[in-house]
Amino acid sequence: MPAFFVTGTDTEIGKTTIAAGLLHAARSAGLSTAAAKPVASGCEPTAQGLRNGDALVLLGQCSLALAYEQVNPLAFAPAIAPHLAAREAGVELSAARLHEAVREVLALQADFTLVEGAGGWRVPLLGRENLSDLARLLALPVVLVVGVRLGCINHALLSAEAILGDGLALVGWVANVVDPATSRLEENLATLAERLPAPCLGRVPRLEEATPAAVAAHLDLRPLGIGL
């Protein structure tokens, strides 16, 4: 069943917003959905344990019954880079450990599954490992979320180059307009469309309420081989 790894050009560029929109679009098409965000920092303490807002959003778009711990098995309180948060907590943040956790979700064989990374493609894990090593172990096709703002062309092209260089397929990208005041917005988007070696799945404007349904209205899953 189709499964994809979602990465971004940076942190705070709307990966979860776009991932939730993609999941909503798949659910609206009658597909069963599942998701994983294997590691997250900046989690809030609750009576049930640490909870991450982004992971909860993804959980809300899963049609299959998943426990929070399946979606987000490694949660850390400090809002810092995951490898630093893990080090402070005395937790071994290895690609192999994250891989085992994600495989549990993939084994559910939902019609449409997303695995969302943290930050960008080269976020550090244990030792010399990066989050990209998890993506390589999973061997999933990649969807790149481009946070459209000043500098995004360089970030997007470098990310695409790294993804392809790691031997993975870049199967789509989404333009998420995080700064609508970006100079030469249309020309920047045209350059991205020309230079990125994958189809654009949609252009999401800055929305007053970026609900999964509102975001899904701007997305197209057909380039991923999912007919709607």
Swiss-Prot record:
What's the source species for this entry?
Answer: Pseudomonas aeruginosa (strain LESB58)
Coarsely, its chief localization is cytoplasm
Protein residues bound to Mg(2+)? 16, 54, 116
Catalytic residues of the enzyme: 37
The protein's name is ATP-dependent dethiobiotin synthetase BioD
Q: Name one Pfam family in it.
A: AAA_26
What's this protein's family per the entry? Belongs to the dethiobiotin synthetase family.
Cofactor(s), names only, from the UniProt record: Mg(2+)
